[in-house]
């Protein structure tokens, strides 16, 4: 690439770059220099790692950061996923802030009390905050004492189920947590009622003991804690992205229950997808889980069913209704223990539809025994807009205003008033049968063999639901542990749990295509089987860039994965406009050259086609590949102010800083006072020897002043005693200014002891533009010697021409009007010395000639020169 000046005079005013080796002394740099090699091709961006990089927080500003840009488009450059290596509790090559850390406080190798910590770039996120339904008191909490919760910046709740959200009031009101909490609108709407019901049913909301003790008898949190936590919770819409202190997260549909969502999280270039509990199968009222448009680096996925396979939903509904119909036919009762929200609404939709299709069942009562569900049914009626198309269409129809306005379902307000006479179906909470209405009905109906209990959800280890699957002959009373009840009631498991099975989970992992998978929310055995199955599936990728690694950490076990994120900078403001103009010119030249090449190829192809037609041959050649037209390397150097905040890097000109960052700026000016024993003419000679030209802007009896390279000011106070009292001033706005000032100061300090000074001061000299010297062995004047070679335009053109001659030899032919041609074979390059332009159909030759001319401009120019050169 060749710099395009506006005029011939301007062309030769371009000073050559300053190299550090040319300065006699360099000061320590207080600024960070970063060099980014950025390259954009038509397919993707390949970016090399910076030679030096550092994460800057709180909008620290680094001046004079240099970016070597090979291609820049649309004002910014993107990159692909960061490269990574991983260890498990081992030291690795990455700094601590470059390590992604996963720490499970609960829900690892178990189902229940889901709570996970992820940490990267000093940002901490907690994913879910549940309680274990099979445990009580503090034992049901995640292991909060194993991690400093005050470090958590954001807490994301995936859905309202107890094992994912029940410890949230405790975290928000009774711990040192100070972060922000987010969940979807529907989840928050249900959260309040669910938590209050949970406190009541599990009896953990009793009044505190007088001494404030924390034993099993004291409450873990109160209704007041729930209400206060409720007010602090913030909401997020599906498909909306929020950014908090450099953490970006987006919510996507997860299926499972109303309001359930996945979170796609981005921190400093690292992408993490947390599925929560999710279902890839659309049911009667919810969407299936979505596949996010971006691919994550790390997937944190549930593994509830491990390698198990679930039956098709149609078959599950057929089995459910068949068992219910058969039990009613023989005069029995059917108990369906469910979670109050989610699975319950799905079953009620199935039963209401089945009853409407079977007249012989319409005299049999179907009851829903849950005060909580009745309260929350209004939420379901409100949020039909986020349900699937079937529900939304049903809601909008005139025949039935709301699909949750059931015709054949009745609610039980008080179990003591329930008239248990004849066959019936009761959908009751809780789903694990630990307490409440479902447990009372189980104990009441258990001795009768005509009755049936159908377990429709996932059964957690240690609960009565899990115990029933073992078909015990006796069950323990919930109110009196010493009393046992004979169990003759039939037991069926027909899982409507809205979780993924192995096939669905495996297909989802394949679609999102992560390089790392962390399995959570699953018992040890099924989770271990799932890990083995996934590793076996991706065994062929081992050792390649597409390798997939799978982890199943235990609770309180830290997983460390090293990610070296790449620094990406956006060029903004006037700096971007300048670069875009340069790039447009380069792209135009590139396209023009490529079009010429395509034209030549087309002409050759047409000639070849004519020959083939004459010979009766068919054309089997392929068309030129146009994908390479846009490949571009510029080598353009861009300088500006680098602003870093929340992992975003912006490169700006100083004057644009306030507009784009709202940062205020200050100018720092440095002064250095020194004294030397020499006259001004000798000082000027030494400075010109180094810099070629100094601009004297004031020369009177009181003061002398000059400017060097428009950066460093040198003042001399002539009113002070013998010697020169010098003040050197410069603005600390970049590394070059500091280095240039150091060089000037070093030259001034060396004048007194320089051998050249001694020699020059011992002879008669005229320290003007030329210097008069004598031979060492004679007092006669020999000839004037210039500080530098001639810098006029004609002389520099001659030296550039000599450089081209040395490069291309006899292939170079000089033409009148300061032009030349270079002919190599059939390829000709036209050179215009005045405009510093090269015209050539061959990109290779054109680039070579332009590089020689560019180097010649640099070599023939001093560091600084008189703007009035002839």
UniProtKB/Swiss-Prot annotation:
Keyword Metal-binding among record annotations: yes
Subcellular compartments: Nucleus
InterPro entries: Beta_Casp, CPSF73-100_C, MBL, Metallo-B-lactamas, RibonucZ/Hydroxyglut_hydro, RMMBL
SMART domains with a match to the protein in the record: Beta-Casp, CPSF73-100_C, Lactamase_B
Physiological role: Component of the cleavage factor I (CF I) involved in pre-mRNA 3'-end processing.
Top class in the EC scheme: hydrolase
Sequence positions that bind Zn(2+) 2: 163-164, 277, 521
Compositionally biased region (Polar residues): 618-627
Keywords on record: Endonuclease, Hydrolase, Metal-binding, mRNA processing, Nuclease, Nucleus, Zinc
Coiled-coil annotated spans: none
Family that this chain belongs to: Belongs to the metallo-beta-lactamase superfamily. RNA-metabolizing metallo-beta-lactamase-like family. CPSF2/YSH1 subfamily.
Acidic residues bias locations: 601-612
Residue positions of the active site: 499 (proton donor)
Gene behind the chain: YSH1
Organism: Candida albicans (strain SC5314 / ATCC MYA-2876) (Yeast)
Domain of life: Eukaryota
EC number: 3.1.27.-
A GO CC term attached to the entry: mRNA cleavage and polyadenylation specificity factor complex
Protein name: Endoribonuclease YSH1
Region of interest called Disordered, as start-end residue ranges on this chain: 598-627
Residues holding Zn(2+) 1: 159, 161, 256, 277
GO function terms (MF aspect): 5'-3' RNA exonuclease activity; metal ion binding; RNA binding; RNA endonuclease activity
GO biological process, one term: snoRNA splicing
């Amino acid at each position: 690439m060749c710099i395009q000046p506006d005029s011939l005079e301007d062309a030769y005013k371009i000073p050559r770059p300053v190299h550090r080796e040319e300065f006699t002394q360099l000061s320590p740099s207080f600024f960070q220099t970063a060099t980014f090699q950025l390259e954009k091709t038509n397919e993707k961006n390949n970016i090399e790692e910076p030679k030096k990089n550092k994460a800057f927080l709180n909008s620290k500003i680094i001046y004079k950061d240099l970016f070597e840009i090979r291609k820049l488009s649309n004002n910014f450059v993107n990159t692909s996923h960061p490269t990574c290596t991983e260890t498990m509790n081992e030291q690795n090559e990455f700094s601590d802030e470059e390590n992604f850390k996963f720490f499970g406080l609960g829900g690892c190798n178990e189902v229940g009390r889901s709570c996970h910590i992820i940490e990267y770039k000093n940002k901490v996120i907690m994913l879910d905050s549940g309680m274990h339904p099979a445990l009580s008191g503090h034992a049901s909490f995640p292991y909060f004492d194993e991690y400093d919760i005050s470090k958590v910046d954001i807490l994301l709740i995936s859905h309202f189920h107890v094992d994912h959200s029940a410890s949230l009031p405790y975290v928000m009101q009774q711990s040192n947590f100070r972060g922000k909490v987010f969940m979807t609108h529907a989840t928050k709407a249900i959260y309040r009622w669910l938590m209050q019901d949970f406190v009541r049913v599990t009896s953990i909301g009793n009044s505190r003991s007088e001494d404030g003790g924390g034993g099993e008898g004291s409450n873990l949190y109160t209704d007041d804690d729930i209400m206060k936590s409720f007010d602090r919770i913030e909401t997020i819409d599906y498909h909306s992205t929020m950014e908090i202190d450099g953490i970006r997260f987006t919510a996507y549909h997860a299926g499972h229950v109303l309001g359930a969502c996945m979170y796609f999280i981005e921190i400093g270039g690292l992408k993490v997808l947390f599925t929560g509990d999710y279902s890839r199968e659309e049911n009667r009222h919810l969407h299936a889980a979505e596949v996010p448009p971006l691919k994550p680096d790390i997937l944190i996925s549930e593994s509830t069913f491990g390698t198990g396979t679930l039956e098709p939903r149609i078959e599950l509904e057929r089995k459910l209704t068949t068992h219910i119909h058969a039990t009613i036919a023989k005069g029995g009762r059917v108990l369906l223990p469910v979670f109050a929200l989610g699975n319950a609404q799905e079953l009620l939709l199935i039963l209401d539809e089945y009853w409407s299709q079977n007249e012989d069942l319409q005299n049999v009562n179907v009851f829903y025994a849950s005060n909580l569900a009745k309260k929350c049914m209004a939420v379901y009626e409100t949020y039909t807009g986020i349900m699937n198309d079937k529900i939304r269409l049903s809601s909008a129809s005139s025949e039935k205003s709301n699909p949750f306005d059931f015709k054949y379902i009745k609610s039980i307000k008080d179990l003591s008033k329930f008239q248990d006479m004849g066959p019936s179906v009761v959908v009751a909470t809780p789903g694990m049968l630990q307490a409440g209405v479902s447990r009372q009905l189980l104990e009441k109906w258990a001795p009768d063999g005509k009755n049936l209990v159908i377990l429709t959800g996932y059964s957690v280890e240690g609960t009565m639901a899990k115990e029933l699957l073992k078909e015990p002959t006796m069950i323990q009373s919930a109110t009196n542990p010493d009393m046992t009840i004979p169990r003759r009631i039939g037991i069926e498991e027909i899982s409507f749990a809205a979780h993924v099975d192995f096939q669905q989970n495996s297909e989802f992992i394949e679609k999102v295509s992560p390089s790392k998978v962390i399995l959570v929310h699953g018992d040890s055995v099924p989770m271990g089987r799932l890990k083995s199955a996934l590793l076996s599936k991706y065994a062929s990728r081992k050792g390649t860039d597409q390798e997939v690694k799978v982890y199943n950490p235990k609770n309180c076990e830290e997983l460390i994965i090293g990610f070296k994120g790449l620094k990406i900078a956006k060029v903004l403001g006037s700096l971007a406009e300048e670069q875009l103009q340069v790039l447009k010119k380069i792209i135009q030249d590139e396209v023009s050259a490529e079009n010429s090449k395509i034209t030549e190829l087309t002409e050759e192809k047409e000639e070849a086609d004519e020959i083939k037609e004459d010979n009766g041959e068919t054309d089997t050649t392929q068309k030129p590949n146009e994908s390479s037209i846009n490949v571009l390397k510029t080598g353009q150097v861009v300088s500006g102010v680098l602003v870093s905040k929340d992992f975003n890097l912006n490169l700006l000109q100083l004057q644009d800083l306030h507009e784009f960052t709202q940062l205020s700026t200050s100018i720092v000016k440095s002064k250095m006072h020194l004294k030397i024993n020499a006259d001004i003419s000798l000082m000027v000679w030494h400075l010109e020897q180094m810099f070629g030209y100094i601009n004297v802007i004031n020369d009177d009896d009181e003061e002398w002043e000059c400017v060097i390279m428009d950066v460093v000011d040198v003042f001399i106070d002539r009113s002070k005693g013998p010697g020169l009292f010098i003040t050197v001033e410069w603005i600390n706005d970049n590394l070059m200014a500091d280095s240039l000032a150091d060089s000037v100061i070093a030259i001034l300090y060396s004048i007194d002891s320089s051998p050249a000074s001694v020699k020059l001061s011992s002879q008669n000299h005229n320290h003007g533009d030329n210097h008069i010297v004598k031979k060492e062995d004679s007092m006669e004047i020999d000839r004037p010697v210039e500080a530098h070679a001639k810098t006029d335009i004609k002389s520099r053109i001659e030296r550039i021409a000599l450089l081209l001659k040395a490069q291309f030899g006899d292939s170079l032919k000089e033409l009148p009007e300061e032009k030349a041609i270079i002919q190599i074979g059939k390829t000709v390059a036209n050179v215009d010395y005045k405009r510093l332009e090269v015209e050539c159909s061959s990109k290779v030759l054109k680039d070579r000639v332009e590089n020689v001319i560019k180097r010649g401009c640099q070599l023939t120019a001093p560091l600084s020169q008189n703007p009035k050169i002839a």
